[in-house]
């Protein structure tokens, strides 16, 4: 039976560390950290995600600023909202909830966010910082995956890692983080020929394919660590990931569950980016390695 890569347990630990830091530094800063989440439209999944983020903020003492715009909001008005949040001195982190409604191009809107307040780590400047190994906000889901690997004693150094998916949200930054940790990395995608031939070579397999239960036992090398980034609602009810967990858990050495794996750590890394930005703005003593073990 595979080791369970439990994101909930790790998320609680990191949240406790963040809460302790906030309580210690609150008087010196004069205000709590602030996270603004901008949601456009009425996508039900996005509404759930935003509610979860607001609850996480409340648990650790981060002020939450929510903006919800109608789905037919023109791009200029969304841009004005971002600029207002950029100028708000009580906001340390800004998240533009994706996906956006049709007609809104996420690229220019993400670029409009102040890079120092980019809580999701998706601004071009911060992706460049990641590429160069410089400090800055990190993409939340890949950063959460790296924390899960570390906390379970899985060192990517010298290992073969395969990332399925090449999105700027997960796949590309995930590959960069694994490479920075001295793994030999392959990115696979929808046009990859003979996918299983690549994935069966992986010591670490990160699946962000966006396809329900796409990866099965035939794709997994015995003893591999498998991280399932996907989350989907089944027609008959319940949730599943991109991995057929019942097949893979008997082969893999480690497997992240869905739900309860990557999802909680994605939210927690959003809080980490926000709190670290708050510390930097107020010159507060902090150590990222102490916050995320």
Curated annotation (Swiss-Prot):
Q: Does the keyword Oxidoreductase apply?
A: yes
Please give a single GO biological process term from the UniProt record.
Answer: methionine biosynthetic process
What InterPro entries does the annotation carry? Aminoacid_DH-like_N_sf, NAD(P)-bd_dom_sf, THF_DH/CycHdrlase, THF_DH/CycHdrlase_cat_dom, THF_DH/CycHdrlase_CS, THF_DH/CycHdrlase_NAD-bd_dom
Q: What does this protein do?
A: Catalyzes the oxidation of 5,10-methylenetetrahydrofolate to 5,10-methenyltetrahydrofolate and then the hydrolysis of 5,10-methenyltetrahydrofolate to 10-formyltetrahydrofolate.
Tell me the keywords, alphabetical order.
Answer: Amino-acid biosynthesis, Histidine biosynthesis, Hydrolase, Methionine biosynthesis, Multifunctional enzyme, NADP, One-carbon metabolism, Oxidoreductase, Purine biosynthesis
Biological or metabolic pathway of the protein? One-carbon metabolism; tetrahydrofolate interconversion
Among SUPFAM superfamilies, the record links this protein to: Aminoacid dehydrogenase-like, N-terminal domain, NAD(P)-binding Rossmann-fold domains
Name the protein family: Belongs to the tetrahydrofolate dehydrogenase/cyclohydrolase family.
Know the name of this protein? Bifunctional protein FolD
* PROSITE patterns the UniProt entry points to: THF_DHG_CYH_2
